[in-house]
Amino acid sequence: MGLGNESSLMDFILLGFSDHPRLEAVLFVFVLFFYLLTLVGNFTIIIISYLDPPLHTPMYFFLSNLSLLDICFTTSLAPQTLVNLQRPKKTITYGGCVAQLYISLALGSTECILLADMALDRYIAVCKPLHYVVIMNPRLCQQLASISWLSGLASSLIHATFTLQLPLCGNHRLDHFICEVPALLKLACVDTTVNELVLFVVSVLFVVIPPALISISYGFITQAVLRIKSVEARHKAFSTCSSHLTVVIIFYGTIIYVYLQPSDSYAQDQGKFISLFYTMVTPTLNPIIYTLRNKDMKEALRKLLSGKL
């Protein structure tokens, strides 16, 4: 009997951080703080990018897509997490778990590809500036964004469907604060080798290949930056690139730790804390890092706050 058949009438018990009751109040503030920052920062980027014509460029098109992703991704996880951190009985309905699994997987996978698209955009802007407008035309940008969203959806359908077919044999105590594939695999009472193989293959496609391509792009960008004669301009470019790469490393690195570790060596308690980084922290960092040193965005924000936009 599959997970779907036997679990439809029973909630999942999310053990979450119940082993650390004193820490739950701190985690509640942590999650709430980062969730609110994510909403404010990313909504601001979407609004400004839409209202200010000078920002109607490929860079801000992708950044707006990333902001929308981050809002939806954290919203699929944070509210349920906040509720469970506040109540003694930490549960989620079977339907809620299925919805959370499909949505978070789709959005997370989409972001993995979209970050690679953004690195490609930066590579062409820096290394091929004379051809940038021709190459990064609106049609190509829309195609790249569409591929990101559709590939994320496909990944979710494969990942989640394979996982939800597993029999649980009455075990509904999920040792996590969200419904996530590695934690659900541990509930299965049958051999999960095939599922782990699917998890590995899909994870390589989404969390190993994209950061490798991003690294190559930034390698070429670094070479181009080194040819800049102005020390100040070179320092500014390196500072911006290092900030972008920091977010990329945190996002992909934490996902790789959770999804590509062998199941027998996976420390679930440690994994839960690491999951907080790519579910709560990086969606907050993205708008800060990608716009902090951007004069156009800061000028547009100033016009918005002064009512001139």
UniProtKB/Swiss-Prot annotation:
Membrane topology annotation: Multi-pass membrane protein
Cytoplasmic topology ranges: 50-57, 121-139, 220-236, 293-309
Glycosylation sites: N5
Any one Gene Ontology cellular component term annotated for this protein: plasma membrane
UniProt KW keywords: Cell membrane, Disulfide bond, G-protein coupled receptor, Glycoprotein, Membrane, Olfaction, Receptor, Sensory transduction, Transducer, Transmembrane, Transmembrane helix
Major subcellular site: membrane
Superkingdom, natural source: Eukaryota
PROSITE patterns according to UniProt: G_PROTEIN_RECEP_F1_1, G_PROTEIN_RECEP_F1_2
Record field: transmembrane: 26-49, 58-79, 101-120, 140-158, 196-219, 237-259, 273-292
GO molecular function: G protein-coupled receptor activity; olfactory receptor activity
GO biological process, one term: detection of chemical stimulus involved in sensory perception of smell
Cysteine-cysteine disulfides: C97-C189
Subcellular location: Cell membrane
Extracellular side: 1-25, 80-100, 159-195, 260-272
PANTHER family xrefs: OLFACTORY RECEPTOR
Role description: Odorant receptor.
Family, per entry: Belongs to the G-protein coupled receptor 1 family.
Protein name stated in the entry: Olfactory receptor 2G3
Organism of provenance: Homo sapiens (Human)
